Swiss-Prot record:
The modification N-acetylserine is found at residue 2. Plays an important role in the organization of the cytoskeleton. Binds to and sequesters actin monomers (G actin) and therefore inhibits actin polymerization. It comes from Oncorhynchus mykiss (Rainbow trout). Residues 1-43 are annotated as: Disordered. The keyword Repeat does not apply. Keywords: Acetylation, Actin-binding, Cytoplasm, Cytoskeleton. Its main location: cytoplasm. It is found in: Cytoplasm, Cytoskeleton. This is Thymosin beta-12.
Amino acid sequence: MSDKPDLAEVSNFDKTKLKKTETQEKNPLPTKETIEQEKQATA
């Protein structure tokens, strides 16, 4: 095992074998106001 990547594998990579996926929106982080409201609601 060598630490160097095998460039032959990379150059032979077939992009057509990849599946097309639907991009999902990432969850945005809550704002400070939202966090404070949740803290007060649970307190």
